[in-house]
């Protein structure tokens, strides 16, 4: 379309990067949007066909051996030049990225051409790419005010917007599961990639919750070898579940990792949560994310190393017997929610990339 604005979105790898980017894209129907991703990553399944997907071969910049560190550097410069060429040939006015290693070559390619580069950082502890490249960005949008403490610089153009979420989180329909309205519901989720350790802890104790009258929806991810081991009509097991909005709005308790997008969804659905941060996350950033909700009284956190099946079982049983506690946690979560994040980020993009 003549005069249509063109935007390249660079988001790859996990739901934490992809879902916020998709939420923003849906707020920009007047833009021609293309997607930059990595071969064989989750975006190849999630990105709708109306966003042309351009994939590159890139494995990030971390490595243990000298060769493992050198090879990604060669890949990085290859991706940089590919992205630069894509921006020029496609006449894109700018790049929007949600972080991760695909963000680095995308930001640098855009700025080398004098194009707009907008970065959204969801984590309370900004990732290395954000800390290194924020000064190069036209604007950095933040998922939480907690991130400001790590990005103190007069050179940075920062806005706290919250983390964009899938539309069904904000506008849930009916939950298409046969769960009675009056029973307590526990939802277990390990993020877009699942969590084998959480799966094992839950299966060691879930019978206690079922005996107490609760229903459990357990989202295991695709790498769950023990899925058939427990059979119970009130224990519903899925690798993933869509849409998540109705499920989280119905949940009384969530047991979850502490990815930034997941925590945004928990606040927007006012779901009390027991958080078990992924212990191998870069710079332990999930613990920093979880601490934001813990300080607000919206969640409790236990390190995976300190948790057993018995302890997990007892904590949840105690919560089930304390409805006032759960109600207070839900209200505290609601106070943290930022429901207009997608629109805020989209409006910032419109201001920086106006109609030609």
Curated annotation (Swiss-Prot):
CDD domains documented for this protein:
GT28_MurG (cd03785)
Q: Which Pfam families match?
A: Glyco_tran_28_C, Glyco_transf_28
The protein's UniProt keywords, in alphabetical order, are: Cell cycle, Cell division, Cell inner membrane, Cell membrane, Cell shape, Cell wall biogenesis/degradation, Glycosyltransferase, Membrane, Peptidoglycan synthesis, Transferase
Q: What is its main location?
A: membrane
Q: Which InterPro entries match?
A: GlcNAc_MurG, Glyco_trans_28_C, GlycoTrans_28_N
The source's domain of life comes to Bacteria
**Localization in the cell:** Cell inner membrane
Report the membrane topology from the UniProt record.
Answer: Peripheral membrane protein
The annotated pathway is: Cell wall biogenesis; peptidoglycan biosynthesis
Q: Which reaction does it catalyse?
A: di-trans,octa-cis-undecaprenyl diphospho-N-acetyl-alpha-D-muramoyl-L-alanyl-D-glutamyl-meso-2,6-diaminopimeloyl-D-alanyl-D-alanine + UDP-N-acetyl-alpha-D-glucosamine = di-trans,octa-cis-undecaprenyl diphospho-[N-acetyl-alpha-D-glucosaminyl-(1->4)]-N-acetyl-alpha-D-muramoyl-L-alanyl-D-glutamyl-meso-2,6-diaminopimeloyl-D-alanyl-D-alanine + UDP + H(+)
Q: Which positions bind UDP-N-acetyl-alpha-D-glucosamine?
A: 14-16, 123, 166, 192, 286
Name any Gene Ontology BP term: carbohydrate metabolic process
Instruction: Give the GO molecular function terms.
Output: UDP-N-acetyl-D-glucosamine:N-acetylmuramoyl-L-alanyl-D-glutamyl-meso-2,6-diaminopimelyl-D-alanyl-D-alanine-diphosphoundecaprenol 4-beta-N-acetylglucosaminlytransferase activity; undecaprenyldiphospho-muramoylpentapeptide beta-N-acetylglucosaminyltransferase activity
* One GO cellular component, as annotated: plasma membrane
User: What EC number(s) are associated with this protein in UniProt?
Assistant: 2.4.1.227
Q: Which PANTHER family does the UniProt record give?
A: GLYCOSYLTRANSFERASE, UDP-N-ACETYLGLUCOSAMINE--N-ACETYLMURAMYL-(PENTAPEPTIDE) PYROPHOSPHORYL-UNDECAPRENOL N-ACETYLGLUCOSAMINE TRANSFERASE 1
**What is the purpose of this protein?**
Cell wall formation. Catalyzes the transfer of a GlcNAc subunit on undecaprenyl-pyrophosphoryl-MurNAc-pentapeptide (lipid intermediate I) to form undecaprenyl-pyrophosphoryl-MurNAc-(pentapeptide)GlcNAc (lipid intermediate II).
Q: Which family does it belong to?
A: Belongs to the glycosyltransferase 28 family. MurG subfamily.
Its name, as the record gives it, is UDP-N-acetylglucosamine--N-acetylmuramyl-(pentapeptide) pyrophosphoryl-undecaprenol N-acetylglucosamine transferase
């Amino acid at each position: 379309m003549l005069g249509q604005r063109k935007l390249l979105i660079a988001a790859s790898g996990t739901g934490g990067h992809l879902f916020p980017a998709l939420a923003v894209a849906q707020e920009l129907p007047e833009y021609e949007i293309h997607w930059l991703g990595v071969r064989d990553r989750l975006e190849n399944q999630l990105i709708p066909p109306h966003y042309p997907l351009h994939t590159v071969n890139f494995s990030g910049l971390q490595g243990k051996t000298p060769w493992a560190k050198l090879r990604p550097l060669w890949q990085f410069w290859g991706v940089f030049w590919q992205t630069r060429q894509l921006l020029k040939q496609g006449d894109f006015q700018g790049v929007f990225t949600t972080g991760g290693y695909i963000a680095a070559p995308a930001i640098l390619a855009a700025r080398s051409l004098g194009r707009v580069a907008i970065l959204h950082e969801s984590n309370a502890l900004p990732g290395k790419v954000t800390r290194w490249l924020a000064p190069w960005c036209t604007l950095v949008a933040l998922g939480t005010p907690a991130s400001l403490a790590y990005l103190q610089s007069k050179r940075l153009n920062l806005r706290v917007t919250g983390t964009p979420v899938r539309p069904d989180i904000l506008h849930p329909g009916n939950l298409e599961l046969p769960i009675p309205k009056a029973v307590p519901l526990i939802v277990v989720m390990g993020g877009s990639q699942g969590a084998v350790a959480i799966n094992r802890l839950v299966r060691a104790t879930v019978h206690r919750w079922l005996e107490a009258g609760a229903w459990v929806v357990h989202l295991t991810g695709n790498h769950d070898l023990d899925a058939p081991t427990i059979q119970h009509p009130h224990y519903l097991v899925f690798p993933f579940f869509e849409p998540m909005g109705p499920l989280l709005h119905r949940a009384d308790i969530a047991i979850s990792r502490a990815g930034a997008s997941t925590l945004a969804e928990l606040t927007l659905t006012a779901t009390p949560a027991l958080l078990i941060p992924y212990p191998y996350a870069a710079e332990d950033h999930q613990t920093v994310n979880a601490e934001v909700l813990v300080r607000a009284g919206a969640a409790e956190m236990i390190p995976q190393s300190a948790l057993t099946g018995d302890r997990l079982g007892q904590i949840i049983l105690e919560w089930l017997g304390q409805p006032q506690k759960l109600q207070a946690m839900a209200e505290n979560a609601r106070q943290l929610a930022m429901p207009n994040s997608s629109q805020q980020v989209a409006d910032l993009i419109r201001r920086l990339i106006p109609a030609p």
